């Protein structure tokens, strides 16, 4: 075995050769540079931002959002798009389901004029477009809706009864192998929306599984399970859903936390409703009977009136949000004036 000085010298020579061949910083000691805090894209619900542990969806990572039909998956993704745009970023939406409603997206705060939209013919085309956009280094957020709709070309060109076992899983595996490094280098967040299926013959455990094979489960830094738990009513009319999101995988913070929030029909996630729930939970808002009070000021009787008060008094809502985030240590509040630094080119 070589002596310690010789080993050190050999290592330095090897590192110099690697830097020369592959560029400076290809290999570095973990202690050489202080890692920057993970930058995030807020989800639109402070309860979900808290459950994620870092204040939102991490940039430069793969995110999977899955759940039953009409549970709020696309709504959560569109709120992330709106927040990315609000911070000065560019977002893209790969609409493989051909079901994006521009009017609904606009109501959630999405700038539909600047949103890049693609409605691809095949799964290969969708993922190739996504990969090219990511490698441009100019995109902050890309949404693929949904994995189940990424139909391989061979299946589209084949007959209706043909068997194409494992084609979609292989397609997803190859795409994620290519995209993951590029996402990290460009700081682009990729949200894959996925559907649920049931495995036949499962005796123990949940029979539910997601489409597209196992690759997405491995490559995802965050996986969100979105469920509708109750219908919100105004008298006899249904006005929205109470939604529960479980963080079933989290590589950037402790997993298995849950968040509950309201999704109102035609309006999306109720930010004010989330602030009331979290404010009461953290002790900033006092609930006495049906009355909600903040620092001696009555917000209203009943949650709906308190929600309307915060809608009309944005300064109070921002103050409550800031206090909650400071107490829980999940970063500063994102304002319209803040601009996220441009992704690093590569």
Curated annotation (Swiss-Prot):
Can catalyze the hydrolysis of ATP in the presence of single-stranded DNA, the ATP-dependent uptake of single-stranded DNA by duplex DNA, and the ATP-dependent hybridization of homologous single-stranded DNAs. It interacts with LexA causing its activation and leading to its autocatalytic cleavage. It is found in: Cytoplasm. GO terms for cellular component: cytosol. Gene3D superfamilies: P-loop containing nucleotide triphosphate hydrolases. One of its GO terms (molecular function) is ATP binding. The keyword DNA-binding applies. One of its GO terms (biological process) is DNA repair. Belongs to the RecA family. It comes from the Bacteria. This is Protein RecA. Keywords: ATP-binding, Cytoplasm, DNA damage, DNA recombination, DNA repair, DNA-binding, Nucleotide-binding, SOS response. SMART domains: AAA. The keyword Cell membrane does not apply. It comes from Mycobacteroides abscessus (strain ATCC 19977 / DSM 44196 / CCUG 20993 / CIP 104536 / JCM 13569 / NCTC 13031 / TMC 1543 / L948). PANTHER family: MITOCHONDRIAL DNA REPAIR PROTEIN RECA HOMOLOG-RELATED, RECA. ATP binds at residues 67-74. SUPFAM superfamilies: P-loop containing nucleoside triphosphate hydrolases (SSF52540), RecA protein, C-terminal domain (SSF54752). Its main location: cytoplasm.
């Amino acid at each position: 075995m070589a002596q310690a000085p010789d080993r050190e010298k050999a290592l330095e020579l090897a590192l110099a050769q690697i830097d020369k061949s592959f560029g400076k910083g290809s290999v570095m000691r973990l202690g050489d540079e202080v890692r920057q805090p993970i930058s995030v894209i807020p989800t639109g619900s402070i309860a979900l931002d808290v459950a994620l542990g870092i204040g939102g969806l991490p940039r430069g990572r793969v995110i999977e959002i899955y759940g039953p039909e009409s549970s709020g998956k696309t709504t959560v993704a569109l709120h992330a798009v709106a927040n990315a745009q609000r911070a000065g970023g560019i977002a893209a939406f790969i609409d493989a389901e051909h079901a994006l409603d521009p009017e609904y997206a606009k109501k959630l705060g999405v700038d539909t004029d600047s949103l890049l939209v693609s409605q691809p013919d095949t799964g290969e085309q969708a993922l190739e477009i996504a990969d090219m956009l990511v490698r441009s280094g100019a995109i902050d957020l890309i949404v693929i809706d949904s994995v189940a709709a990424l139909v391989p070309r061979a299946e589209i060109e084949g007959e209706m009864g043909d068997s194409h076992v494992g084609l979609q899983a292989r397609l997803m595996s190859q795409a994620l192998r290519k995209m993951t490094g590029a996402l990290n280098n460009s700081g682009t967040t990729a949200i894959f929306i996925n559907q649920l299926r049931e495995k036949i013959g499962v005796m123990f455990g949940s029979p539910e599984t997601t489409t597209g094979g196992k690759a997405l489960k491995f490559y995802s830094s965050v996986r969100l399970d979105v469920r509708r738990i109750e219908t919100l009513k105004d008298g006899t009319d249904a006005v929205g859903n109470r939604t529960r999101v479980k963080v079933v995988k989290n590589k950037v913070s402790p997993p298995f936390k849950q968040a509950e929030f309201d999704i109102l029909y035609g309006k999306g996630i109720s930010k004010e409703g989330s602030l009331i729930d979290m404010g009461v939970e953290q002790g900033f808002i006092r609930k006495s009977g049906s009355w909600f009070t903040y620092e001696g000021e009555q917000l209203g009787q009943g949650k709906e009136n308190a929600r309307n008060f915060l809608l009309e008094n944005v300064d109070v809502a921002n103050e409550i949000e800031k206090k909650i985030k400071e107490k829980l240590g999940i970063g500063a509040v994102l304002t319209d004036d803040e601009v996220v630094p441009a992704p690093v080119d590569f």
